[in-house]
């Protein structure tokens, strides 16, 4: 009986299940979008029960599409939107509030208060992260402080916190297992990435009871088995990693200096720095890349909040395109951006600027500016933001990047990939299997149950679908980058501080 690995890929806008074979090829995919909830400007929430329901649904669907039985699944890997925070009652299994999403800015003011107390330095030293509303810690605190009765329940030991991975595993095991992995823990702003444990001082500062927190384990190990009610059989849950770290693993960036960019809702650049946690002087995050083989490996990360989401905005709000795919056609109908720059700082701007008060802007408009120029400027914004992050990474790590591995939905846009290569001045490699996030989780799960022997076996699965080489003159490139940097400065510090 042929065996497979199931990967549950719980993203920001959809829940997916992908089944992989031994060669790392996609056997089947099932996907369901779920509701985005925007209670106030800058606030973003999800319904944890809807996420769990849809995730369980697509798992069954993917098995049906592949025409395989649950007995043929050797292990399940989970990868998830990181930082998104769920707090639930362990007695009832019910969330006390909606999941507060990574993009949500509601705790920016509280982060400013912590910064005024000089705590940003402590947080960076311990967690490798910037003090920002993006991470889970202040979201947990907000729930405890603002949801009626939550603080009392937490003090009594009745509330559990988890990122989406923890929430899924808890439900898959019928509440038996409350666990996360090193990569997800490293995104909470509560985890000491050097000592590899929850940090008592940070928990005290934020007034978060330790009893709420999950046990932290390696990214590749058997956490437990699914309850039989789910598939009719028990299947080992054996891999867990945050989406960006999973993509780094799926892209087989196993050596220091190897990097990938995922062009999803946001863009996320990660560079493996090996067993050394590199402290960033350029506004990047130091994070855990993977916990495997009895050790952890670290990475530098640049987070770009709005990547592919700018294309959704062109489609849904401005109605300039009917589908995301059309953007490539429009962008190539004009010779250049005609001096138009779009800075998509809809929820502030991330690395290496970190300004919560920046807002989106379109600059350089003249009477000759057309729809095509704005669409092109939107695509180009992803490449410029990637350039800024990559330069910061090279400076911090002292490693010059030779090539960039790419994945995520927008990497299928050939115009964008060519422009990315031009602006970076390095080769951009798109792999055969672009589902690298799900693939990374599958690899972690498969290694834990002996489905794959080791990382060498996995590396042989990686293959290039298309390579893009830089073809732009330096002078033109420098001029474009200069224009972009000018545009970014105009977008910063726009929103009034409360």
Curated annotation (Swiss-Prot):
Entry's SUPFAM superfamilies?
Actin-like ATPase domain
Q: Write down the Gene3D superfamilies for this protein, in alphabetical order.
A: 3.30.420.40
Q: Which residues form the signal peptide?
A: none
List ligand-binding residues for ATP: 12-14, 265, 308, 312, 409
* Pathway the protein acts in: Polyol metabolism; glycerol degradation via glycerol kinase pathway; sn-glycerol 3-phosphate from glycerol: step 1/1
Q: Name one GO molecular function term.
A: ATP binding
| Description of how activity is regulated | Activated by phosphorylation and inhibited by fructose 1,6-bisphosphate (FBP).
The GO biological-process annotations, alphabetized, read as: glycerol catabolic process; glycerol metabolic process; glycerol-3-phosphate metabolic process
Q: Which UniProt keywords apply?
A: ATP-binding, Glycerol metabolism, Kinase, Nucleotide-binding, Transferase
Instruction: Please give the InterPro entries that the UniProt record associates with this protein.
Output: ATPase_NBD (IPR043129), Carb_kinase_FGGY (IPR000577), Carb_kinase_FGGY_CS (IPR018483), FGGY_C (IPR018485), FGGY_N (IPR018484), Glycerol_kin (IPR005999)
**Job description of the protein:** Key enzyme in the regulation of glycerol uptake and metabolism. Catalyzes the phosphorylation of glycerol to yield sn-glycerol 3-phosphate.
NCBIfam families listed in its UniProt record: glycerol_kin, PRK00047.1
Family affiliation: Belongs to the FGGY kinase family.
- Assembly with partners or alone: Homotetramer and homodimer (in equilibrium).
The record's section on HAMAP family has: Glycerol_kin (MF_00186)
* UniProt name for this protein: Glycerol kinase
Q: Which gene encodes it?
A: glpK
């Amino acid at each position: 009986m042929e065996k497979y690995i199931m990967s549950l890929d719980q993203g920001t806008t959809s829940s997916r299940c992908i089944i992989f074979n031994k060669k790392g090829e996609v056997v089947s995919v099932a996907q369901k979008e779920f509701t985005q909830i925007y209670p106030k400007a800058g606030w973003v929430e999800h319904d944890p029960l809807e996420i769990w329901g849809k995730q369980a649904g697509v798992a069954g669907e993917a098995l049906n599409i592949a025409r395989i039985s649950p007995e043929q699944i050797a292990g399940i890997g989970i990868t998830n939107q990181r930082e998104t925070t769920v707090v639930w009652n362990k007695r009832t299994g019910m969330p006390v509030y909606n999941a507060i999403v990574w993009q949500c800015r509601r705790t920016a003011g509280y982060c400013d208060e912590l910064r005024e107390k000089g705590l940003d330095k402590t947080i960076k030293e311990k967690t490798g992260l910037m003090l920002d509303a993006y991470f889970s810690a202040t979201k947990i605190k907000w729930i405890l402080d603002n949801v009626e009765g939550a603080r009392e329940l937490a003090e009594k030991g009745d509330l559990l916190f988890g990122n989406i991975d923890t929430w899924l595993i808890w439900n898959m095991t019928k509440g038996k297992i409350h666990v996360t992995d090193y990569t997800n823990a490293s995104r909470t702003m509560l985890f000491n990435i050097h000592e590899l444990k929850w940090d008592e001082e940070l928990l005290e500062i934020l007034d978060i009871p330790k009893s709420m927190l999950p046990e932290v384990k390696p990214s590749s190990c058997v956490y437990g088995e699914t309850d039989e009610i789910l598939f009719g059989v028990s299947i080992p849950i054996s891999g867990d990693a945050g989406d960006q770290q999973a993509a780094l693993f799926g892209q087989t960036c196993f050596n220091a200096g190897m990097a990938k960019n995922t062009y999803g809702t946001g863009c996320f650049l990660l560079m493996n720095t090996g067993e050394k946690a590199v402290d960033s002087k350029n506004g990047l995050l130091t994070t855990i890349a993977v916990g495997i083989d009895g050790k952890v490996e670290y990475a530098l990360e640049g987070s770009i909040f709005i990547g592919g989401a700018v294309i959704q905005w062109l489609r849904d709000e401005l109605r300039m395109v009917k589908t995301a795919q059309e953007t490539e056609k429009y962008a190539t109908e004009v010779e250049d951006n005609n001096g138009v720059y779009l800075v998509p700082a809809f929820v502030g701007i991330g690395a290496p600027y970190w300004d919560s008060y920046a807002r989106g802007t379109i600059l350089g408009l003249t009477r000759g500016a057309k729809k095509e120029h704005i669409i092109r400027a939107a695509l180009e914004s992803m490449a410029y933001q990637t350039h800024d992050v990559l330069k910061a990474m090279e400076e911090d790590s002292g490693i010059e990047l030779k090539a960039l591995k790419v994945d995520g939905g927008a990497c299928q846009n050939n115009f964008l990939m060519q422009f990315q290569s031009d602006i970076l001045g390095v080769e951009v490699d798109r792999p055969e299997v672009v589902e690298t996030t799900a693939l990374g989780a599958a690899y972690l799960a498969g290694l834990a149950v002996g489905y794959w022997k080791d990382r060498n076996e996995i590396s042989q699965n990686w293959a290039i679908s298309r390579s893009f080489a830089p073809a732009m003159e330096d002078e033109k490139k420098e001029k474009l980058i200069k224009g972009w940097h000018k545009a970014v400065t105009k977008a910063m510090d726009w929103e009034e501080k409360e």
